[in-house]
């Protein structure tokens, strides 16, 4: 029974996407920020518990990255629709995720392997994205943070979008193109 705790935490993070997005739409950015930080901390907690107590499950390995992606995309769209992030930036982020999603699906279908795991640049991209969302919500809540902090975080996200996509295309993309040629 205790072994289900990481999956329960992950499921809660999955469900938090809805209130986070709603609070951003309503302009209740501080509450959205609080829930977003809680969701982010839960990501570390579920992974820690699963590894420490060997509560790793196939379901958890599937659900955890899905919950992370829903949290990021849900928050991204809410920030876009409330004009807290520029649309060109949102399209760039969604395009990156689309490239990785299509590539991962092709890789899985062609090689029947999930070896196309997130690379270190993708993990940095996620970290910078989370930092950006926190900065945007902090600025919207308190208006005391200078806008250049957002620009620095956006530059970091863009940098890791480029690195992660190039790295992905050089490795998994090369194998996919060899297979279909």
Task: Give names to the regions the model predicted.
Residues 1-181:
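Alpha-helical transmembrane bundles and membrane-interface segments of multipass inner-membrane proteins
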């Amino acid at each position: 029974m205790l072994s289900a705790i990481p999956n329960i935490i992950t499921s809660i993070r999955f469900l938090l996407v809805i209130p986070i997005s709603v609070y951003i739409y309503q302009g209740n950015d501080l509450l959205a920020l609080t829930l977003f930080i809680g969701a982010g901390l839960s990501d570390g907690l579920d992974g820690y518990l699963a590894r420490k107590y060997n509560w790793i499950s196939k379901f958890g390995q599937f659900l955890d990255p899905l919950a992370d992606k829903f949290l990021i995309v849900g928050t991204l769209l809410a920030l876009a629709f409330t004009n807290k992030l520029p649309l060109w930036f949102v399209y760039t982020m969604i395009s990156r995720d689309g490239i990785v999603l299509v590539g991962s699906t092709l890789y899985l279908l062609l090689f029947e392997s999930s070896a196309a795991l997130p690379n270190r640049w993708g993990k940095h991209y996620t970290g910078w994205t989370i930092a950006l969302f926190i900065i945007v919500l902090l600025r919207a809540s308190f208006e005391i943070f200078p806008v250049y902090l957002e620009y620095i975080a956006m530059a970091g996200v863009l940098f890791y979008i480029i690195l992660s996509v190039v790295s992905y295309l050089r490795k998994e993309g090369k194998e996919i193109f060899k297979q279909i040629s």
